[in-house]
Amino acid sequence: MSFQNNAPGAAAADQPAGEGPTAPVVSAVGHVTLVGAGPGDPELLTRKAYRALQTATLVLYDHLVGPAVLDCIAPGAERIYVGKESSRHTLPQEQIIELMVRLARSGRNVVRLKGGDGYIFGRGGEEVQALAEAGIGFDVVPGITAAQGAGASVGIPLTHRDHACTLVFATGHLREDRTVGLDWELLARPRQTVVIYMGVGALPAICSQLIAHGLPADTPAAVVENATLPTERCLTATLATLPALAVAEKVQPPALIMVGQVVQLHPLLARPGTVLQTAQTAQEAKELASA
């Protein structure tokens, strides 16, 4: 029987999620290694992550793991795409866990490959908890999370003695009622950097809520798209103007929202030759929105 996987970057040997592997059982009970793939640039894989990929025989990987990282997987290793995009999953999370447990119980040694760090908004904790409850051995290999990669790549330090003594990561994922359930009073405190994952779809609501809960409308803010990749973009503005800039520039996930005084360092610390994209005034935002 032949299999075809239409996932981005999938090799010819890949199998679609839901199809069982044909390799023989290698032990009575297998093992799972949860590997963080980092923010996208394969040069940012840890040595331990790279070694796990080079010795892998079976890899379950998500949507945010790009072709350059997949190229680091050992030739001949089976790949199963279990991609998860916003509101569109190849497999529901529960079925991903079931598949992982079934493969391990059949004796397979599985690499579970996730973008960024599996324990930071990657649902890795849920997956490892399920493995522990099923009595399956596991290891966790941390990865550079997207916020770290983005900050270093675009020149926005996450903390700075003069600007931010607190760092907060939050998820901007929309709930079923299309609201963002965050602790806005916590996020609106001064002298901190807030990085919001999965928040592009809720960007106007996020900015307006931060302003409503006390942050000045002219607080520096940025959205970083495709961090660390050749297609990376960083748009800087203020809480008041960032939504219009993001619409004008057609920002798409994966992207991070970064809020705080550290954002103002981007023009100074960005790599030489970086084209700065910004909207700092209400007039600029209005012009962008009507463009």
Question: Residue locations for each model-derived region?
Answer:
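Hydrophobic packing residues within well-ordered alpha-helices of enzyme cores
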Residues: 69-70, 131, 150, 206, ...
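Class I S-adenosyl-L-methionine
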Residues: 1-42, 47-144, 242-243
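Active-site catalytic pocket residues across diverse enzymes, especially alpha/beta-hydrolases
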Residues: 73, 154, 210, 214
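Class I SAM-dependent methyltransferase SAM-binding "motif I" and its flanking Rossmann-like core
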Residues: 3, 22, 41, 117-190, ...
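Short hydrophobic/aromatic-enriched beta-strand-loop microsegments
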Residues: 77-84, 135-139, 158-165, 214-223
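Generic secondary-structure boundary signal with a strong preference for alpha-helix termini
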Residues: 48-52, 128, 134, 155, ...
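A contiguous loop/helix-start segment that scaffolds small-molecule binding in enzyme catalytic cores
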Residues: 2-14, 18-19, 29-32, 95, ...
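Surface-exposed loop/turn and secondary-structure junction residues enriched for glycine/proline
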Residues: 42, 47-48, 56, 67, ...
